[in-house]
């Protein structure tokens, strides 16, 4: 963290942190406790500033639940299948697990992250790798299955008692309707 380095090197005595507090409302508490790896990373995209500047609701590219961080336990525990291991799939799996559900996350490729793995390649975009790393770290207790394409047969057999969340879509594909 830049603030950490500035204070450690005697450049300043304190730093004001703005956008990262929107990205992770527990930023200060986690930093104070030394839990730096648990902080949801801000990528400095400025999306939050758009809402502030134009009097609109604040939103965050990295934290879809900004200003709504409390996750209540589900009144009824369910089995949940999340199809797709991109950012939406990882967030859906995290929230479902946090609510107390039994969660399986299936990703057809050999790694999680989806299009974020490509988005972090251009010069100046390496911060995005921190988002993927953070999101992966939040999947403790989730049954993550890589190299797994969910088929109709799997849904009819192994996952017949599951609620299904489909989070695919960055690569257009024809999907056969399920009846």
Show which residues each predicted segment covers.
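C-terminal structured "cap/appendage" subdomains that terminate the fold
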Residues: 4-14, 26, 126, 136, ...
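General beta-strand structural signal in soluble alpha/beta enzymes
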Residues: 17, 146, 166-167
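Flavin-dependent oxidoreductase catalytic cores
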Residues: 1-83, 87-103, 111, 171-179
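A conserved short coil-to-beta-strand element within the FAD-binding core of flavoproteins
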Residues: 146-158
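Phosphate-coordination loops involved in phosphoryl transfer and adenosine-cofactor binding
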Residues: 76-80, 147, 161
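Short low-complexity, flexible loop/linker segments enriched in glycine and/or proline
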Residues: 6-9, 29-32, 118-122, 126, ...
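Glycine-/small-residue-rich beta->alpha transition segments that form the dinucleotide
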Residues: 162-163, 167-174
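Beta1-alpha1 glycine-rich phosphate/pyrophosphate-binding loop at the start
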Residues: 81-146, 179
